Design a protein with these regions (language model features):
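N-terminal ligand-binding lobe of clamshell/alpha-beta domains
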Residues: 1-268
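Single conserved hydrophobic/aromatic residue that forms the stacking wall/gate
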Residues: 267-275
Length: 275
């Protein structure tokens, strides 16, 4: 984080003019009933859909218009990860208050919700949301524990080069009853640490392949035609599934709800000939 959270907790009612450089804080503020504080969002915001109509879009994911953001006179700007470090630095040089989260696990996602709740004086509502997500996760775990067979799952975040699941996605796979074949790679902080070769996937021979290419549609046919992939169980059994990036690659409420449901739906039931 670039600023201490306590700065805003101590102020009356918290910040009143918030710019969200990524979708997650926007969705969180809406769920907290604090959307009236939002004055700017990213062009990639799709949750909730009404946000695009209500707030000006002032940033992409990596960069944004410092001038437009400053013209909104924000008292807090919220962003995500080292990918937005350059934009954050520009905004700080422009005397803006910037808060950068870097949540990579489900627990960290929940902590972000609680932190934003504290910042906008909506702690009780934030705790209620988090309790609900924890309950849903426990239900998913209990359901998964009843499954005799835990399918091996390969999640592909990008195709060339291929990147396997980031940490929270790997955790969702495990919660839903699957076994992430590259779970160790998910602990890497950098995307490069999750790079895999197509031959590595062949060696792992997953039962299910989940694909969510950040920024473009998944080409299932091209995946099928990769060298050696015709021997993979998931390919032979037509178990390649695309998941919308907006519900799985956003480290916020979307992943804990629609993302978890999508992962559960695509691999909880396997054809008997895949075992």
């Amino acid at each position: 984080m670039c600023i201490p959270v306590g700065v805003y907790v101590a102020s009356q009612g918290g910040p009143q003019r918030i710019v969200c450089l990524t979708e997650e804080p926007t969705e969180i503020l809406y769920l907290l009933g604090e959307e009236h504080r939002i004055v700017g969002i990213t062009v990639y915001t799709v949750r909730p859909p009404e946000a695009r109509e209500r707030h000006p879009m002032v940033s992409a994911f990596i960069d944004g218009s410092v001038r437009k953001i400053c013209e909104l006179e924000p008292d807090l700007i919220i962003g995500f990860s080292d990918i937005q470090a350059d934009l954050a630095a520009k905004l700080i040089k422009a005397n803006q208050q910037v808060l950068i989260f870097n949540q990579r696990t489900i627990e960290e996602i929940l902590e972000v919700i609680l932190t934003i709740g504290r910042i906008v004086a909506a702690e009780e509502r934030a705790q209620h949301l988090v309790d609900g997500y924890r309950s849903a996760i426990e239900v998913a775990k209990e359901r998964a524990n009843k499954i005799e067979y835990r399918p091996k799952v390969y999640f592909e975040e990008w195709d060339e080069p291929a990147f396997s699941a980031i940490r929270w996605v790997s955790e969702l796979i495990e919660i839903a009853g699957g076994e992430d074949v590259f779970s160790e790679k998910s602990h890497g902080k950098l995307a490069a640490e999750r790079e895999v070769q197509w031959s590595d996937v062949v060696d792992m021979n997953p039962d299910v392949i989940l694909a969510s290419w950040c920024g473009k549609p998944v080409n299932v046919e091209s995946m099928r035609n990769r060298p050696g992939w015709d021997s993979i169980t998931a390919v032979r059994n037509n178990r390649i599934h695309e998941i919308d990036p907006s519900i799985i690659l956003q480290p916020g409420p979307a992943s804990l709800t629609d993302g978890l449901r999508a992962v559960s739906y695509t691999h909880l039931t396997l054809p008997t000939n895949s075992r």
